């Protein structure tokens, strides 16, 4: 027996996995369900885990696996008083994306996670597990610097970037400043200004007039090599 919100969240996650192969962010789930805070999403996910519908994959950010879906076509009864959907039957577990599906994406060069550095052109290809990529066109950049460490992005990591020229508040983006310097930062708007926020207290936010900043992509995933 699931609540209507649990049912709605489960299907939203599955739709995103089917479309892009990557779980939605907590912010996207919050907006999709019309909730005011992410804590409500945390509670819903925990409840779905306890009931065996959902599993969090260890050591991976934004990694959720739908284990089963309720068979709503055969038996759904909604009780408006307590907002509960009663479910009689669920199909077998869904197949996750194969872990060995590999896609090659262009490796453009290095990007600063500190202060902006020169953007690089194409040099080589990087083999990436398909599960780390969503829909759309992607490229990779090697991270240089430590200003995003509190977001789990470290020097030498490969940032997997979905090509885009727009960003939402709080997205981690590749921002091109003055047409020549690229940097990886959180994207914020302050009136007519763009603020590029680090994730390291040792660095200050960078503020620029909006016309000086061009979004070149949004962070889709990370690849880390251990030597």
Swiss-Prot record:
Which regions of the protein are recorded as binding DNA?
26-46
Q: Which reaction does it catalyse?
A: Hydrolysis of Ala-|-Gly bond in repressor LexA
Q: Which GO BP terms sit in this record?
A: DNA repair; DNA replication; negative regulation of DNA-templated transcription; proteolysis; SOS response
Kindly give the SUPFAM superfamilies that the UniProt entry links to this protein.
Answer: LexA/Signal peptidase, Winged helix' DNA-binding domain
Q: What is its EC number?
A: 3.4.21.88
Instruction: Kindly list the residues the record flags as site (Cleavage).
Output: 113-114
Keyword Cell wall biogenesis/degradation tagged: no
State one Pfam family annotation: Peptidase_S24
Q: Which UniProt keywords apply?
A: Autocatalytic cleavage, DNA damage, DNA repair, DNA replication, DNA-binding, Hydrolase, Repressor, SOS response, Transcription, Transcription regulation
Q: Which family does it belong to?
A: Belongs to the peptidase S24 family.
Q: What does this protein do?
A: Represses a number of genes involved in the response to DNA damage (SOS response), including recA and lexA. In the presence of single-stranded DNA, RecA interacts with LexA causing an autocatalytic cleavage which disrupts the DNA-binding part of LexA, leading to derepression of the SOS regulon and eventually DNA repair.
Which NCBIfam families does this UniProt record tie to the protein? lexA (TIGR00498)
Share what the entry says about its subunit structure, partners included.
Homodimer.
Its protein name is LexA repressor
The organism is Sphingopyxis alaskensis (strain DSM 13593 / LMG 18877 / RB2256)
Q: What is the primary gene name for this protein?
A: lexA
